[in-house]
Regions:
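Short, polar/acidic, helix-capping and beta-turn segments at strand->helix junctions
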Residues: 1-86
Length: 86
């Protein structure tokens, strides 16, 4: 296990298996030394987390949705690097 995986474990973050593309796009693209990750959406319990902060969702719910997206991005990066985030 690498440094980044160890740090994720310390933070209690478990990376989900990256979702398959839901439409006609690829989840990530490697170009030279760069990895471009497609847009990630917050999905919780099989449903999209949507809404306007302060109107239909709370600030805490919005923060959780952003965290879900960030974790999904890291998951895609791990897939792109063949499980080597370091």
């Amino acid at each position: 296990m690498g440094l980044i995986d160890n740090r994720l474990n310390e933070l209690g973050i478990i990376l989900p298996k990256p979702p398959k593309a839901a439409a006609n796009y690829i989840p990530f693209k490697i170009s030279d030394k760069f990895i471009f990750v497609s847009g990630q959406v917050p999905i919780k319990d099989g449903n999209f987390v949507i809404g306007k902060v302060g109107n239909t969702i709370t600030l805490e719910e919005a923060k959780e949705a952003a965290k879900i997206c960030g974790i999904s991005i890291i998951s895609q990066l791990k897939e792109a690097t063949k499980n080597n985030l370091d």
